[in-house]
Amino acid sequence: MAQQTAIRNPQSAMEKTNVQMIISGVGGQGVLLVTRIFSEIALKEGYPLIGSEDHGMSQRGGSVLTHIKIGDFDSPLVKKGGADVLLSLEKDEAYRTLHYLRPARNGQRGGLCFINAPDPDYMNPEIKTCLEEQGIGVYIFGADQMAREMGSLQSTNIALVGFAAAHPGFPFSHDRLRAAIERVTAQRFRELSLKIFDRSLLEGRKILKP
């Protein structure tokens, strides 16, 4: 059975921004740590925060999906076509969650999609073209390889966050993300996690464009 929990910060009155995010992957990839990093930034800066965690069969490598809404929202679930950002730690899970991404409308760009995959051309060309025609940015990064090269395959999640942080349209600045990673990661993993974040950020800056 999938389990769903809500995260709220009802005391905050700040309304600086409205952001809707989806993080997807499979059990063991650290989807929930990524959620915690983003939530940490929102809570520390006083943004209203609401979200949902769908753990599914996460203990056995099943799908894991989290919804995060920062700003003035009532429902914790991101609707189809509502996500500003999708981070997928597993390429097949990305296909299952692409429908959440927001198309360009009313003069605003579409959502941003960051996917962990070893081959930058893995995505079906027709699907990628369809997304791009909707103004959705699709960015693929070998986060597994980066984390493995740096000696910590379990830090694939940190590598993908670092890569995404290089995009100027990403809702959190790299310095805020780095500070949040430093706060939420266990001490024994902290130094290497920060190195992986920094290295992936540099790689992202070579690749990503607004």
Which residues are covered by each model-predicted region?
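Arg/Gly-rich low-complexity intrinsically disordered repeat tracts
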Residues: T5-M14
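Active-site cofactor/cluster-binding pocket
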Residues: A2, E15-P210
